[in-house]
């Protein structure tokens, strides 16, 4: 069984501030929204840096993606995939489209 496929506007696990998937493949959609794949970034948000208050603004890409399901040569993003470096993970995706 696979994990829910993520898409533009879906949430990532928050740290200093919330963020969502910002980039997707415009001509490949899940639930009528562009899918987000390996290498696609989230919205600008705050990231904690030890010893440097306050949090800094950054974006981060999906580092991992499906090894089996590819979109334009990139692994499709799924809930639980790592976003980084040193960032978070994909938190939300399609309720009815899964990828292994």
Per-region residue spans from a language model:
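Intrinsically disordered, low-complexity proline/glycine-rich segments
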Residues: 1-100
């Amino acid at each position: 069984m696979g994990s829910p496929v993520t898409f533009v506007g879906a949430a990532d696990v928050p740290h200093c501030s919330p963020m969502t998937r910002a980039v997707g493949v415009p001509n490949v959609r899940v639930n009528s929204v562009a899918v987000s794949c390996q290498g696609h970034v989230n919205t600008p948000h705050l990231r904690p840096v030890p010893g440097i208050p306050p949090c800094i603004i950054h974006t981060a890409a999906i580092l991992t993606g499906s090894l089996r399901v590819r979109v334009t040569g990139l692994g499709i993003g799924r809930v639980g995939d790592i976003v980084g470096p040193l960032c978070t993970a994909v938190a939300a995706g399609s309720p009815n489209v899964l990828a292994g």
